[in-house]
Amino acid sequence: GEVRARVKIDVEACVREAVLSLGYNDEAVGLDGRTMRVINEIIPQSPDINQGTALELNKDKEIGAGDQGIMYGFACNETPELLPLPYVLSSRMMRTFETCGDPIFAPDGKGQVSVEYNTEVCGPRRLAKVLMSNAVDYRQINGLSREAIKARAKEIAFGCLADWVDKDTVFLFNPTGEWQAVNSCSAADSGVTGRKLVVQFYGGYPGAQLGGGAVVNKSPEKVDCSAAFGARYVAKNIVAAGIAEKCAVQLSYAIGIARPFSIYINTFSTCGSATDERLAQVVEELFDLRPQGLIERFDLLNGDIYRRIPKTLFMDDYPWEKTDMADKLM
């Protein structure tokens, strides 16, 4: 990666701290943050880019977008969080596994749910399937059979999803049969940062598109980061205002230029009070979607945010989850 800074950062220490905070403290669970090898290949940012995007070089709040690209935001009224139900349920399940404290389940895992929808009312009807893949620390199983481990995982998953589970909900756990913790994480899968954007961006919900770049490895002048939050903020406030039942917001930017290259809104024929084109005009008038405006509104120079967003971009008390613009949109 590239970065330009006036401070010296102990990159290796930061990396080790982050890895250990995720529970990777033993090679038996795939990785040990204390003994792993850290290779630092961060280099200075190109001066050609830096001259148009650096905060300290642009005091007039017109810093340009750190790159060109298209970012999307989405909201719908399926849940109190104004997010698609499958995204909310799968996120809830993953958080529960992370915090349950059961030593059998190692840090490496991923979940997926399938929700059946009622096409007549365009709303969720039932939770059809739940899939949980999680590395198992076989040092901790104390003779438990594979079926007993699955039963324990099912109890955790169905417990946190109880309001949607029914007698016909199917549960799958480690469908290949076995996933040993020693063969998890970087010991088995090199991967790259931001490899599975759909996990963070609305869970593949129809109509909720993905932008071209990851969020979690970007500084805020990179609109892959800040504008993704801005687009979600706009969409959520439109739905919170009761203007539409669901809303997708597309923002595009040109590198070095502060204001959006384009603004596009799609309310999927659920807005009866205005056209999508008129909504886009109102959004451009009411929302400051320049990188500096987004950085200030969302407090994106606060380093604590970047410790949290790798786990979830939405649902928490993030500034872009506020609906404080809903009244102004009405």
Predicted segment positions?
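Short, charge-patterned binding micro-sites
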Residues: 1-6, 255-259
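Alpha-helical support elements that line or immediately flank enzyme active sites
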Residues: 75-95, 220-242
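Glycine-rich and small/hydrophobic secondary-structure elements
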Residues: 2-15, 19, 74, 78-81, ...
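Internal helix-turn-beta structural module
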Residues: 246-330
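Glycine-rich anion/phosphate-binding loop at the beta-strand->alpha-helix junction
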Residues: 139-239
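Conserved phosphate/anionic-ligand binding catalytic regions in large, soluble enzymes, centered on
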Residues: 63-79, 180-213, 304-317
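Gly/Pro-rich active-site capping loops and adjacent beta-alpha segments
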Residues: 28-41, 46-51, 55-60, 67, ...
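Glycine-rich, mobile lid/loop segments that gate access to catalytic sites or pores
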Residues: 13, 18-24, 28-182, 317-326
